[in-house]
A protein has these predicted regions:
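Outer-membrane beta-barrel strand-turn architecture
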Residues: 230, 323-326, 358-362, 449-455, ...
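Surface-exposed loop/interface segments of Gram-negative outer-membrane beta-barrel transport/assembly proteins
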Residues: 168, 179, 233-299, 340-347, ...
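Catalytic cores of large soluble enzymes that bind and process phosphate-bearing ligands
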Residues: 122, 126, 308, 312, ...
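Short, small/polar-rich motifs associated with maturation and membrane association
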Residues: 2-353, 358, 365-367, 371, ...
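Alpha-helical support elements that line or immediately flank enzyme active sites
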Residues: 183-184, 444-449, 463-465
Length: 558
């Protein structure tokens, strides 16, 4: 045994820890770059600051560093404990056309900090949100989940400066994030972006510096430009159907104390305070709690009660694309669903997208992008709190020695030391519900005329209608104590009832007139943009509430 231990120790000490930092030629941190030991499966990725740590068995090993849109770089470790790595853009991609503010450019003509991601990179992700699919794919762009609730939007920031301006098919969207829609008076750009069908996206371009200045003050935190897919000229009709069905499981979670460990911890704490632990629990009682076999000495596992295994998440998408000499089209429909690790939390979204472009003459083109969205999330209506957070906290706040049910009878919810965290009440049937429903319709129409001397005139009009509804019903369920002598259950209401509906409608209009001039004279390019924008929106919010006398009215018509 001693020999084996010595050998294992020697092997452990032979490993070398290598740290490093990965950036692009502008000094921008690259998040999510792959760092692997060449010829092995040993690897890691860079963090939000572009840093990485990796253990290697041989200091003469070679690291391979790669990231989308950049050349893979190899570096020998040698005696260096910290590596500074600079990745260069792949020159083969420099002739690609990139969407920028009010136009397009080739990558080699760009002077600002602009990054883009194509459709194939986005669709490798199984995220239900666009920001989630974009995570780790663009240097300087960070994403942060508000919480793990199904369908909850992910906040996106450029250089950690705050929420950017979102421009989708040329239409700008500002507004608040998805947690604040009940207070917001306009259309949330973050919501519109996160609820896009990822399969419909052709590319995402991020403007990080002065390149965003053309959008004015609203772009002070950067700009995210989204271009959706279109049909191609003389392209045959193509029908595509794809999707996935998966199961979600927690990969890591703190191990919770059982009843025996909890009781022993209390006894040891009393002893450390100079008190007599036997006054709290006798040795016989402690042994019974640790055995957990006798009535009244059961251990309760609140992790198993709150968390579920193999929770489904799915997505299905169907699209038709094609084009003739004059008309190109793209049509898609998609449905996404996700359940939470906790029961009775659910999210569903259906997307519809139609893009069509028609050349009326050789110089005159008209087109439209029409989209619709139906989105619904279901939560538990826990009194006095958030059912999702309360369910997570319940695993830590509930004591493993107290039963969720009075006398272990599942017909009676126990009156525990903190009733707001008893998971026995965390269901829509007992505590009620809080549902959010969003319906959105959007149409963008444009007309464009190309003059013969390099001038292009374009007019765009957009109409967006968003209706959001909150529907909540909190039940006054009872909590009970058990009288062992009388064999009776004594109940009291956990909280008062309430019934509420909030309806918010936002019709928004946007118009853009634009003149573009582009001319190439030998090796020189001349370009100019003249534009005019106008936008307005209406906001209507209706709030209804009452205190029902019973839990058994399924709906009150307001």
């Amino acid at each position: 045994m001693c020999v084996v231990q010595l050998l294992l120790s020697a092997a452990a000490f032979a490993q070398t820890q290598v740290t490093g930092h990965v950036a692009d030629v502008r000094g921008e941190d690259i998040i999510g770059a792959n760092v692997t030991v060449k010829g092995t499966s040993n690897g890691t990725i860079t963090d939000i600051d572009g840093n990485f740590t990796i253990n290697v068995d041989d200091k003469n090993a070679t690291l391979a560093i790669s990231f989308i849109g950049y050349k893979t770089k190899e570096m020998k470790i040698g005696e260096k404990a910290h590596l500074q790595i600079v990745l260069e853009e792949d020159m083969e991609t420099l002739d690609e056309v990139v969407v920028v503010g009010y136009g397009t450019q080739t990558k080699k003509s760009l002077t600002g900090a602009i990054s883009d991601v194509k459709s194939d990179a986005l669709t490798r992700s199984v995220s239900t949100t666009t920001a989630g699919a974009l995570s780790g794919k663009i240097a300087g762009v960070s994403t942060r989940a508000v919480d793990a609730r199904p369908g909850r939007g992910i906040n996106l920031e450029i250089r950690n400066m705050g929420s950017p301006l979102f421009v989708i098919d040329g239409i700008p969207y500002g507004g608040m994030n998805s947690r604040d829609w009940l207070q917001a008076s306009d259309v949330s750009g973050s919501d519109v972006f996160n609820a896009l069908n990822i399969e419909d996206i052709e590319s995402i371009t991020v403007l990080k510096d002065a390149s965003a200045a053309i959008y004015g003050l609203r772009a002070s935190n950067g700009v995210v430009l989204v271009t959706t897919k279109k049909g191609k000229k003389n392209d045959k009709v193509s029908i595509n159907v794809n999707g996935y069905y998966g199961w979600q499981n927690l990969t890591r979670f703190p191990e919770l104390a059982n009843a025996g460990q909890y009781v022993r911890g209390l006894a040891e704490a009393a002893q450390n305070r100079g008190e007599d632990p036997s006054k709290l629990y006798s040795p016989e009682e402690l042994a019974k709690w640790e055995a957990g076999t006798e009535p009244g000495y059961k251990s309760y596992d609140y992790y198993d009660m709150v968390m579920r295994k193999n929770v489904p998440q799915y997505h299905i998408n169907a699209n038709v694309t094609g084009g003739s000499e004059k008309t190109n089209y793209y049509l898609s429909v998609a449905h996404t669903g996700q359940d939470a690790m906790m029961p009775d939390f659910k999210y569903e979204r259906t997307n519809l997208q139609l893009n069509i472009d028609t050349k009326i003459t050789d110089r005159f083109t008209i087109g439209a992008q029409i989209s619709g969205k139906y989105e619904k999330s279901e939560d538990v209506g826990l009194p006095g709190g958030d059912g999702y957070y309360s369910a997570i906290l319940a695993m830590f706040k509930m004591q493993p020695i107290e039963s969720p049910y009075a006398n272990d009878n599942p017909e009676y919810i126990n009156n525990v030391h903190e009733n707001g965290y008893n998971p026995a009440a965390f269901s829509r049937d007992i505590a009620g519900y809080k549902d959010n429903l969003t319906r959105n319709a959007n149409i963008n129409a444009y007309a464009q005329y190309d003059f013969s001397f390099g001038l292009t005139a374009k007019a765009t009009f957009s109409y967006n209608y968003t209706n959001s509804r909150f529907d909540g019903y909190q039940y006054a369920y009872h909590i009970y104590t058990y009288d062992k002598e009388k064999d009776t259950y004594n109940g009291t209401p956990a909280a008062g009832r309430w019934r509420s509906q909030i309806d918010r409608s936002v019709p928004a209009r946007y118009m853009q007139l634009q003149l573009n001039y582009a001319k190439q004279i030998k090796n020189h390019n001349i370009s100019a943009v003249l534009g005019y924008e106008a936008s307005d929106y209406d906001w209507t919010k209706k709030t209804y509430g009452t205190e029902p006398s019973t839990d058994y009215l399924p709906l009150l018509q307001f």
